Amino acid sequence: MADNMTTTQIEVGPGATNATINFEAGILECYERLSWQRALDYPGQDRLNRLKRKLESRIKTHNKSEPESKRMSLEERKAIGVKMMKVLLFMNPSAGIEGFEPYCMKNSSNSNCPNCNWADYPPTPGKYLDDIEEEPENVDDPTEIVLRDMNNKDARQKIKEEVNTQKEGKFRLTIKRDIRNVLSLRVLVNGTFIKHPNGYKSLSTLDRLNAYDQSGRLVAKLVATDDLTVEDEEDGHRILNSLFERFNEGHSKPIRAAETAVGVLSQFGQEHRLSPEEGDN
């Protein structure tokens, strides 16, 4: 087991989570106002509806982890999100909210900088994907699956059989694809399973998925902390299935880690986390 392996993640605390949810709620408010003006086309209307469903689900999940005094409804978060937009767009702290201030307002020698060039803002230290190191989470009875010299269909079936033996709760799964003693793929997954009364098992939380290429280089990663998790059971089931499907190409050609990563990251719309070079590997 790769207990001594160093991996990478973005660390997102509860403050950033609240800010993100509130900002997206503000975006939803803008979408709705545009819709009321009959200025939203059909694709835009579809995005509005999907964003609203996702936000309602995410707020419900997030509120469970918050003390009752800090729980907020979607409508309350919309109001805060609109104020955040005013701060971001106009750099006007008087339009803002407590605890949220643009980076330049806190760090510029000139507090009145409405013409700041956003491209000049330095990044927040340590928040790049490759800047924060993390050890794999320790989980009781971690599972390692070695897929050696078998076709992709058999490999996929073995993964499904192994995963179905996982107990409810947190899990760590390491998948190694080995063809003719060449390690062509390694995937490390951390998450949480929920088992339903009918025996159906769904992935409720996907905390991390790391994909490594033939040389052991980490080519892509999807990491969530705090309550940034799979937003509903359907998402979790689809994401896990997308991982399985990468092993079902119908031939014995080694599967590249980048292809696997693209397949999984695309479920979150996170393909941009791969550079073009990594995506082509």
From Swiss-Prot:
Any single biological process term in GO: symbiont-mediated suppression of host type I interferon-mediated signaling pathway
Source organism superkingdom: Viruses
Location of the motif Nuclear localization signal: 50-55
Region listing for RNA-binding and homodimerization, in residue ranges: 1-93
An example Gene Ontology CC term for this record: host cell nucleus
GO MF annotations, alphabetized: protein serine/threonine kinase inhibitor activity; RNA binding
Pfam family, one: Flu_B_NS1
Signal peptide: none
Region of interest (G1P2-binding), residue spans: 1-103
Disulfide bridge partners, by residue number: none
SUPFAM superfamilies: S15/NS1 RNA-binding domain (SSF47060)
Cell location: Host cytoplasm; Host nucleus
Subunit (UniProt): Homodimer. Interacts with and inhibits human G1P2 conjugation by UBE1L.
HAMAP family named among the record's database cross-references: INFV_NS1
Function: Binds and inhibits the conjugation of the ubiquitin-like G1P2/ISG15 protein to its target proteins. Since G1P2/ISG15 is an early antiviral protein, NS1 may inhibit the host antiviral response. Prevents EIF2AK2/PKR activation, either by binding double strand RNA or by interacting directly with EIF2AK2/PKR. Also binds poly(A) and U6 snRNA.
Family membership: Belongs to the influenza B viruses NS1 family.
Name under which the protein is recorded: Non-structural protein 1
